[in-house]
Amino acid sequence: MKKVHLIQADITAFAVHAIVNSANKSLLGGGGLDYVIHKKAGPLMKEECVRLNQEKGGCPTGQAEVTTAGNLPAKYLIHAVGPRWLDGEHNEPQLLCDAYSNALFKANEIHALTVSFPCISTGVYGFPPQKAAEIAIGTILSMLPQYDHVAEVFFICREDENYLIYKNILSNIDDPNIQILIS
């Protein structure tokens, strides 16, 4: 049975096979969590991001790329590029859904058994937290059963507001194929 966990913690200190980074299009580091991950992961991960930027021009919004996790407690980093919130009329919900689904696809592709997700786009990109949580949870729960390799997903919320929103949504889910665990 697949498992989905909700934990309030620092995603950079949580050991899993793959950590999803809320990245920007350049993959070269930005603000918020992206800045923290780049700082803590170190030079090897940064070199891979520079290479991806040079070879592919970065990563389009809604897509994801994989690098080493460097000094973080994971084997891989999956850099998912979420959208900036403008007004909800510029395809932002679909792009956020795509960011989560492509990150999960990449996790399965690299045979990650466990993967942690942050609250993509809710920080400096300004996506409304309630709407973002609904999209994140809905996307992961609908796609997770399709994948053979990913056994556990961890939603890691640092801020109280996001944690409480995720907790409220996940507490009301009853899926016979997925065990929901709230810490």
From Swiss-Prot:
Keyword S-adenosyl-L-methionine in record: no
Keyword Transport: no
Keywords assigned: Plasmid
Entry superkingdom: Bacteria
Domain named Macro: residues: 1-174
Family: Belongs to the MacroD-type family.
Name of this chain's protein: Macro domain-containing protein
Species of origin: Acinetobacter sp. (strain ED45-25)
